[in-house]
Amino acid sequence: KLLTDNDIPTLNEINNIMETIQQNNDEKAFLILSLAVKCALTNTEICSLNKEYIVINSNDEMYINYPPKGNNRISRIIKVPDDVAVLLDRYICNNNIIEGAIFINKRKTRIKLRDTERLLEKYCKLNIEKGMLNNKFTMQTLRHAAICYMLSGGASKDLVASYAGITTKWITRYDKIINSDTYKQAVDYSIISINA
């Protein structure tokens, strides 16, 4: 299915949601949504994130190294943007996470997919009530937005597909959006960058 402009939140809408989260001092929600928007992580990847998957290279750059799973047996390595790396490091320190799940729920167990969707829904509703948002978005639409902004920012389809952990055949579903006037004008090259 080709995606349209209406399927993807704009930078202003994402910004409004993030500002509302900051105003509510919700460090966990801010980090979760940052991982979706700036790293194009899936909801499943966010919920399954373990401390052991986080690595720092010799240049002090943070990466997430998801172990191989499924039939392809290929690990996925994601470069974490510096601003998100600071948030993630602070969250780990503030919550004294030594090992295991990065995100836990109120029951002190690993956060579930529905928990993250509820977090996002809560802040979408607050923005709808303030007239700052027209539609609710899902974790998947935030990931779609991340991919669209990378493509709009000039990253190659192959590089974006590799970073997002998908095949290039799936990238064509974003063509209509990145070629629309809305995204040509709205793209903010600083929101997401990919270094080859």
Regions picked out by a protein language model, each given a short descriptive name:
Residues 1-16, 107:
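Flexible interdomain linker/hinge and immediately adjacent N-terminus
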Residues 11-41:
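Basic, Lys/Arg- and aromatic-enriched nucleic-acid-binding interface segment
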Residues 14, 28-30, 113, 117, ...:
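Short, leucine-enriched amphipathic alpha-helices that occur as contiguous helical runs
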Residues 35-48, 153-155, 164:
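A short, glycine-centered helix-capping/turn motif at helix boundaries
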Residues 48-84:
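Conserved tyrosine-mediated DNA breakage-rejoining catalytic core shared by Y-recombinases
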Residues 70-89, 100-122:
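C-terminal catalytic core of Y-nucleophile DNA break-rejoin enzymes
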Residues 121-162, 166:
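Short, basic (Lys/Arg/His-rich) helix/loop patches that form interaction surfaces
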Residues 173-196:
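DNA/chromatin major-groove-contacting recognition/catalytic segments
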